[in-house]
Regions:
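Bulky hydrophobic segments
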Residues: 1-123
């Protein structure tokens, strides 16, 4: 493989990693430092979806943004539906950082927020 083919993927990974770190940092600020109101819940959900998108870009930098957005949407919807089982809440009670990845309770509004955030990122 030539160097010129590796460089764009490498650059895309570096950019995705930096943006992912920034997104996770913002998410933690929203989660820990701001009041727990609807606006921060919406912001946190949007940042979660964006973080998932960036993580997929980090793993697969050659995929098209639309395909990456689709994978991120499937993950976000799957995690939200998984919350209907009560397992994420139980895991979060034992290991609280898991709540940041798995959430706790199902909220249909979250599904809309994930999809809107991903549509904006992909556009």
């Amino acid at each position: 493989m030539s160097d010129t083919r590796l460089r764009p993927r490498f650059r895309r990974r570096i950019v995705a990693l930096l943006l992912l770190a920034l997104t996770v940092g913002l998410g933690l600020v929203v989660h820990t430092a701001l009041p727990d109101i609807a606006a921060t819940d919406i912001a946190g959900d949007a940042l979660y979806a964006i973080a998932v998108y960036l993580f997929v870009v980090l793993l697969t930098p050659r995929m098209s943004p639309l395909f990456v957005g689709g994978i991120a949407a499937v993950w976000c919807v799957g995690i939200e539906l998984f919350q209907l089982t009560g397992i994420p809440e139980a895991v979060g009670a034992v290991f609280s950082p898991a709540m940041l990845v798995l959430g706790t309770v199902f909220d249909a509004r979250d599904l809309v927020i994930y999809l809107v955030a991903l549509a904006i990122v992909v556009a």
